[in-house]
Amino acid sequence: LDIPYTGGNPQCLSYCYDKSLVRGIAKEIGIPVPQAFFVNPMDSTFDVTIDFPVLVKPNFGDSSFGITRNSVANSAEELLQAITDIRKKFGYEKPILVEELLTGKDLTLGIIGTPPGSFQTLPVSEEDYSMLPPELPRICGYEAKWQPDSPYWSIKSVRAELPPDTEKALVEWSVKLSERLECRDYTRFDWRLDAAGIPRLLEVNPNPGWCWDGHLAKMAAMGGMSYSDMLGAIIKSAEERILMEYGANIRMKEINMRQEIAV
């Protein structure tokens, strides 16, 4: 349709919504990820190659669909039940990713702009689980985002307090991933610290929610940016990018025309 738009292109979205693919790309460029293994569609047997507890999630998708308190498994029996639950809800033809359950700080970092061009990083935010009943696993899944009557709705986002080296790594790795995956205009990166305090990539979110109470808006507010200014910055990034792409296309057409005339 040739209609300009903000955010990632179809290729970027298809890459980022494949969690195992993003993991592979991250590892390839030296970015830490949780230990994990893959369960193929219709597999009835598989090797458990990591220690419990684990987090079971659909390999494809976004918005935490399929990730609930029941996605945390502390035994083989609970793992099989979690896999069965996902297959019943999302289909037996869908692959499943099983990751080690990290319990360090649960972090997210936002970028507005398009690296390596003009961009700005937003303050790192942390999920505050202090109001969550102690018996529930500390994860920010579907219940925290879509079910107001859930105890997970009590989770708050606060500005993260991190060692300078850790924050520096988060920014550098997020920018590196943004470039490699060709994310554009606005992106959010989810991380979690391991037992040694090392950030490990959970997910890359191209075109993350920009609603007024979403993570991106909260991080922008932490950095002193109003909601309208955040939206304006996203649109400005897209305008600058589209103008550059348009100019490059015009120049290429001019070159092709000259070559045709010369022939």
Describe the function of each predicted region.
Residues 8-11:
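Short beta->alpha connector loops at strand-helix junctions that form conserved
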Residues 1:
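N-terminal glycine-rich "phosphate-gripper" loop used for MgATP/nucleotide binding
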Residues 76-165, 195-200:
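Phosphate-binding site of ATP-dependent enzymes
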Residues 13-97, 103-105, 115-116:
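Active-site nucleotide/adenylate-binding loops and adjacent lid/helix of ATP-dependent enzymes
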Residues 27-31, 161-263:
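ATP-dependent carboxylate activation and anion-phosphoryl transfer catalytic cores
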Residues 4-5, 33, 54, 227:
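Hydrophobic beta-strand scaffold residues
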